[in-house]
Amino acid sequence: MPLELPSLNASIVGNTVQNGAVEQFLNIRYADIPGKFEKPVLKNDWNGAEIDATKVGPVCPQPRTPFNFFSVPDDLWEKVNVDTYQDGLLCDNLIVTRPKGVSANARLPTVVWIHGGSNIEGSIYNLIYEPQFLVAESVRVGKPIVHVCIEYRLGLAGFLTKNGKGNWGTWDQYTGCQWVNRHIQDFGGDPLNVTLTGESAGSVAVHNMLIKDSMNGRKLFRNAVMMSGTLETITPQPPKWHARLEEKVAKVTGKEVADLASLSDKELLDAQIKLNVAVCMTCDDGDFFEPGWKQHLTPDWLDKLIISDCKDEGMLYFLPVNAQDDEELLAKVAKSPVGKEISELYGIKEGGDIKSACLDLKTDATFNYFNHLLFKKMEEARNNGSTSRVYRLAVDEPNPHNPDQRAHHAVDVLYMFNSTKFNEHGDKLSRLFQSHFLRLAYGLEPWDHRNFGVYRNGGYQQLPLSELNKVRPVERYEALSKMDFGQVGRLSNALSRL
């Protein structure tokens, strides 16, 4: 029996999963894309159509992930790289997952997920982000939620500028959030109780969405979760920076800059690979990032915000760092204007474990230092009258599938979704991890705000915020705050560049 969607002038047919406890609706188009390098147009009316939401939808063209980053079991790896079809103009779709049979007036808390992948890869159809297990757990513990995953444009298709404007993938994300606000009540969700979540580039996107929502009247989100990324991780670059990228793309494709929109999906992706684009940057174009946006960096109007990171985030860069000789790494440090200070602070010296020290710098300079700064700013805002609560989470528990990978970047995603066949202990930890976010969605404290949460040594504990230095190098962060961080970032980038 199709589900009626009055606000969309449509009905919809989906799938039943989790032994009948959960319903899932795939490939719901939330926006139309008029053309390459164009803003999405919110899709509000289906003209009475019945939507077939039983099959996976198109994803943005992207390079295939070459190795098993998460060390998931072999029988699951191909499902991680699910072979969906790719289309740069049809990829604005989303997944809604909900408890079976929820009524339209249920007003369940709604959780929205934005995946990571450096703005060049990733998909809502990746098994790692499969939400049915989280929704089933929400039912089991009596805190049922509606969950939404948003697909968006990636790579040059999503972030190459045109006439000084850009951020097409970012506009997609925001339009998806607007769709949730307008239409999630048809699925039993509460548009006034939305928790926005994301990891890595998805966490940066959460920060971007909060800034935009703050400037537009704070209507879309009540709570947020930022896992390993703030706007400082992928900072908006000026139009001149993006204009240089346009020129490079034109050169490798043999096109004029004015004709780049005529490139096919394949030609754009080939250009991206030839230029070795490892991260796609947003653009400070005065459009998505409106004048004055820097005054809205601290989302101190939210009810609650969780900021989390992993102990060994820098393991993301293990391959390029490990591929270099110690002498090469030392030479890069010596050449930097902040090299002497960084060498002393991290112990990047002859006779030491140079590669591990470089990965520690990558951990701080790309992710954890910025998390620390945002947490401090939120705490300061609280002291100055903000009613928002901020919660700090440290994920130091190693990858349950391969502990040798340590608590690497994105290992927390495994615990968030619990979709990769953990052993009994890993499953228990994952359910505990999920409980924090379900409590948040229900307006409850995920843990005592006077403490921070930490996953390590096979378990979970809370420690007073005054003891954060036991699990994070707070003194090192303070030393970094006194340096020219632009130079620190350039050195960090150089260390992982072959």
From Swiss-Prot:
Question: Catalyses which reaction?
Answer: a triacylglycerol + H2O = a diacylglycerol + a fatty acid + H(+)
Q: Where is the active site?
A: S200 (acyl-ester intermediate), H409 (charge relay system)
Keyword terms, alphabetized: Disulfide bond, Glycoprotein, Hydrolase, Lipid degradation, Lipid metabolism, Signal
Q: What is its EC number?
A: 3.1.1.3
Against Pfam families, the record matches this protein to:
COesterase (PF00135)
The top EC class, named as a word, is hydrolase
What protein does this entry describe? Lipase 3
Give glycosylation sites per the record.
N193, N384, N418
Q: Does the keyword Repeat apply?
A: no
What GO terms are given for molecular function?
A: triacylglycerol lipase activity
> What protein family does this chain belong to?
Belongs to the type-B carboxylesterase/lipase family.
Question: Any one Gene Ontology biological process term?
Answer: lipid catabolic process
Source superkingdom: Eukaryota
